[in-house]
């Protein structure tokens, strides 16, 4: 279609004075773009994308997600999901950010009625930030105490009954002594402890008791509240937010430089840990346990759902960082190459992290003389702060060194992820209120992030983390990603979008991308979301169900995030009247005058290009129907003809 609403000289008449408003918004956008900072070079952008996409999701979440969902067989649905959902969504978000030079909210000038998608994603991002920072606090805590002459979780305290030390050999001796005194045939292995019989309490390792009793001071009943913040974790949380602020305070000028370290250092540590891990006794069994496929799990829909969730969590799609990072690129930057590098590297890092972690856990099972490695693996937070420390404490040579390396690596990975998420929020605010100084917004939002994080460093904090992650992070991000894709491909139109890509990248869009964006990606996401909603079960923490009030609060959290989409759409139609309200709604589904490249000269060239494309299609329609459909097919397939 001809772009009457985005002519460089004047906008379309919207009635009730909205033409002047649109012109003012357009002028503000062009002024902002002229002042918008770009990456120092393309490598800074690539390193930043790696630092957010290759993070805790690869080392912490992927290993236990894989082993819980078929082991090596999980790699098959994960790779399929990566190619049909992960890569297409990642590339699409890169394109949207770079094409418009705008953040997560402002890009919706393409379909103004969908602006609520951007605000909803911002809400989901804030939820993720709130608990992600508490994981950094835990990581910092373990990092600091790792400098002691003896790892504090490797030995029992006097007040801990039924505790066995996590020291090398002594742990095994104590454990085997406990076994010999009990009815071995009645053993019920659970985690890294077990129940000897009905009258014997569960033996627990010192690493588990240290985490539960010393670090988080776990509270198993939150009906009377979550308790007060722990001062040590509060201090660690404060330090984490100071580091985050220092990295983002100057925008991409500072975060771009930090990205080199944030992206590359974890690989150095990961390779060091890998070399050490594969040389440990029992490592081979752990690796085989991780990679051995359970083919029956491929027919389990839950496995496919978990593959999608892991893909979103790992690549950070649907929450805004990729759009935000790409918005600071030059218009002609080669993002196709970067998208392929990051998504491929993300998968390889997940495999590398899984092999490393399960090699360590294999050694733990060997030391405990436990045949089933499943019995030493904990999911969630316990994997990073119980199973890993327990395994490291059994290293014969300088376990303190490997503990420092491991937790510093986790901290760097977490910083890389949260810097991107926090920068997304700062960019949204600065795009909306152009007179604000970036560093001031970064300071205020960092202070707010610290205050929100306090609830997670209380004795009941892990309950809140589980609740917010489930309702406010996973499901909000997922449903809004569906709306994001639908708005661009189905409402704005696949052909329009592909024309924009061709103009920006100077290359036709291949059949693979067209098929994924128009069919495979949205259909798979919709089916998986419906299945997830239909089979959803009450969430639990530490095998305990949440109180009914907590579940209600969780659903309210989800409703607030998802409701941003329709509410902001109705608001836009109300504030941009086009006669009747129905006409206003229809108009909100068409690109506004602000849509397109932000640079005025590039914008003029784009308008000419789009109008030429519209003229070509108008000419094609006047030919025979057979020829018309043939040309439509070749256009869809990305032919250059």
From Swiss-Prot:
Pfam families: SNF (PF00209). Residues 25-34 have a biased composition (Basic and acidic residues). Keywords: Amino-acid transport, Glycoprotein, Ion transport, Membrane, Sodium, Sodium transport, Symport, Transmembrane, Transmembrane helix, Transport. It comes from the Eukaryota. GO terms for cellular component: plasma membrane. It is a multi-pass membrane protein. Glycans are attached at residues 183, 188. This is Sodium-dependent nutrient amino acid transporter 1. It comes from Drosophila yakuba.
């Amino acid at each position: 279609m001809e772009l009457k609403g985005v002519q460089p000289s004047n906008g379309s008449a919207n009635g009730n004075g909205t033409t002047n408003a649109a012109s003012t918004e357009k002028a503000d956008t062009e002024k902002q773009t002229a002042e918008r900072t770009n990456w120092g070079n393309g490598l800074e952008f690539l390193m930043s994308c790696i630092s957010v996409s290759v993070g805790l999701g690869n080392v912490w979440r992927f290993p236990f997600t894989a082993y819980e969902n078929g082991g090596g067989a999980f790699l098959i649905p994960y790779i399929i999901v990566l190619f049909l959902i992960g890569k297409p969504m990642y590339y699409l978000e890169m394109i949207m950010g770079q094409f418009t030079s705008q953040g997560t909210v402002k890009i919706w000038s393409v379909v103004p009625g969908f602006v609520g998608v951007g605000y909803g994603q911002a809400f989901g991002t804030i939820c993720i930030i709130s608990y992600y920072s508490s994981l950094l606090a835990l990581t910092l805590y373990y990092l600091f105490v790792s400098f002691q002459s003896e790892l504090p979780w490797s030995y029992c305290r006097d007040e801990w009954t039924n505790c066995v030390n996590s020291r090398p050999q002594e742990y095994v001796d104590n454990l085997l002594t406990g076994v010999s005194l009990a009815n071995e045939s009645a053993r019920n292995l659970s985690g890294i402890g077990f129940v000897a019989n009905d009258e014997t309490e569960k033996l627990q390792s010192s690493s588990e008791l240290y985490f539960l009793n010393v670090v988080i001071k776990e509270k198993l009943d939150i009906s009377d509240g979550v308790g007060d913040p722990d001062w040590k974790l509060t201090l660690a949380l404060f330090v984490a937010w100071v580091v985050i602020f220092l990295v983002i305070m100057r925008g991409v000028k500072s975060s771009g430089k930090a990205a080199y370290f944030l992206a590359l250092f974890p690989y150095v540590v990961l390779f060091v840990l890998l070399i050490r891990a594969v040389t440990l006794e029992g490592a081979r069994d752990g690796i085989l346990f991780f990679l051995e496929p359970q083919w029956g799990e491929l027919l389990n829909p839950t496995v496919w759902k978990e593959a999608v969730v892991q893909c979103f969590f790992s690549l950070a799609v649907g929450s805004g960082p990729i759009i935000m990072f790409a918005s600071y690129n030059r218009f002609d930057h080669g993002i196709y190459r970067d998208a392929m590098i990051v998504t491929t590297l993300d998968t390889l890092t997940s495999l590398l992290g899984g092999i490393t972690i399960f090699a360590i856990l294999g050694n733990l099972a060997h030391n405990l003389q436990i045949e089933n490695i499943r019995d030493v693996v904990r999911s969630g937070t316990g994997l990073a702060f119980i199973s890993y420390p327990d395994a490291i404490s059994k290293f014969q040579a300088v376990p303190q060194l490997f503990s420092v390396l491991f937790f510093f690596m986790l901290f760097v990975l977490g910083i890389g992820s949260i810097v991107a998420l926090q920068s997304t929020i700062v960019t949204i605010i600065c795009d909306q209120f152009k007179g604000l100084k970036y560093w001031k917004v970064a300071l205020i939002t960092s202070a707010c992030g610290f205050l929100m994080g306090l609830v997670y460093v209380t004795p009941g904090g892990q309950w809140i983390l589980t609740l917010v992650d489930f309702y406010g992070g996973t499901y909000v991000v997922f449903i809004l990603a569906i709306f994001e894709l639908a708005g661009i491909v189905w409402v704005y139109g696949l052909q329009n979008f592909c024309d924009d890509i061709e103009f920006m990248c100077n290359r036709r869009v291949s059949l693979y991308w067209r098929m994924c964006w128009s069919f495979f990606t949205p259909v798979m996401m919709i089916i998986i979301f419906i299945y997830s909603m239909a089979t959803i079960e009450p969430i639990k923490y530490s095998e305990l169900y949440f109180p009914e009030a907590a579940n209600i609060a969780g659903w309210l959290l989800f409703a607030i995030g998802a409701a941003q989409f329709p509410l902001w759409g109705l608001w836009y139609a109300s504030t941009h009247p086009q006669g009747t309200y129905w006409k206003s709604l229809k108009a909100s589904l068409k690109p506004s005058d602000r849509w397109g490249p932000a640079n005025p000269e590039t914008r003029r060239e784009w308008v000419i290009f789009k109008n030429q494309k519209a003229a070509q299609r108008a000419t094609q329609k006047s030919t025979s129907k057979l020829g018309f459909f043939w040309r439509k097919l070749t256009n869809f397939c990305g032919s250059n003809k």
